[in-house]
Amino acid sequence: MSKIIFMGTPDFSTKVLEMLIAEHEVIAVVTQPDRPVGRKKVMTPPPVKRVATKHQIPVYQPEKLKDSQELDVLLSLESDLIVTAAFGQLLPESLLNAPKLGAINVHASLLPKYRGGAPIHQAIIDGEEETGITIMYMVKKLDAGNIISQQSIRIEEEDNVGTMHDKLSFLGAELLKKTLPSIIDNTNDSIPQDDALATFASNIRREDERIDWNMSAQAIHNHIRGLSPWPVAYTTMNEKNLKLFSAFIVKGKKGNPGTIIEATKHELIIATGSDDAIALTEIQPAGKKRMKVTDYLSGVQESLVGKVLL
């Protein structure tokens, strides 16, 4: 049985780790340090750590893997293979070259498209109708190694980051399970990526979360989907932030971009930079919980029609 070091951090990684534990010998897990979460800043372990601890697998949590004591330990383990899935750090070249079978990554896009840390978000924001999982050999350059296997999946109009995250996490574990035998036997026919076709999905920044109402309704809809339920798109109303969780396109309604042109029982309808509008259905006003627009409107006394979102 192959000795595997697993490296990953968020929920996306847990399905891959659970599959590896069931099918192989995981000798160590490397994940990010515990972080403060929520208003009370409670120190919280990454999801991967919880899975590893449950199975009594040694866990290492370096702030930065390069030049750390943990790196020396990992190099001494004589592993057969390193598997990563959304780990969140680049691996030192010494570690990439240490295992007998190399290091592989489970990446949530159809490489060479969407290299980087936010491939699911960016694919939806860009209006892609398809994405997938790539199993690839790791090299020093980010997400640029040879492709071992790929599997695609449709992005439906109603999908958002949350639903695609769940679909892709299961798909990643399934594809890795099918692919691992050829990696372990060294019988796979990996193919180089075409760097000329590479696109990038950098981590989402705060400024990326703000809605530009001058964009088309389709682009705004994709932006809301591509950031929901995390980190969440937002706009401002009455100089207060308003988070936007779900919406749909209303054809043929126009007005000055960002203006509330109608407030129905269930939606706030906002003009955009195109001939169509956006109907907001689920929001989170500043200082309040996430709620349906229906519930929000029931507590609002003034008319919102004519107000401008910025």
Curated annotation (Swiss-Prot):
Q: Where does (6S)-5,6,7,8-tetrahydrofolate bind?
A: S109, L110, L111, P112
Q: Which reaction does it catalyse?
A: L-methionyl-tRNA(fMet) + (6R)-10-formyltetrahydrofolate = N-formyl-L-methionyl-tRNA(fMet) + (6S)-5,6,7,8-tetrahydrofolate + H(+)
User: By its UniProt entry, which InterPro entries does this protein fall under?
Assistant: Fmt, Formyl_trans_C, Formyl_trans_C_sf, Formyl_transf_N, Formyl_transf_N_sf, Formyl_transferase-like_C_sf, GART_AS, Met-tRNA-FMT_C
- For this entry, the protein name equals Methionyl-tRNA formyltransferase
Instruction: Give the record's family classification.
Output: Belongs to the Fmt family.
Asked whether the keyword Protein biosynthesis is assigned, the reply is yes
Q: Which GO terms describe its molecular function?
A: methionyl-tRNA formyltransferase activity
Originating species: Staphylococcus epidermidis (strain ATCC 35984 / DSM 28319 / BCRC 17069 / CCUG 31568 / BM 3577 / RP62A)
> What EC number(s) does its UniProt record assign?
2.1.2.9
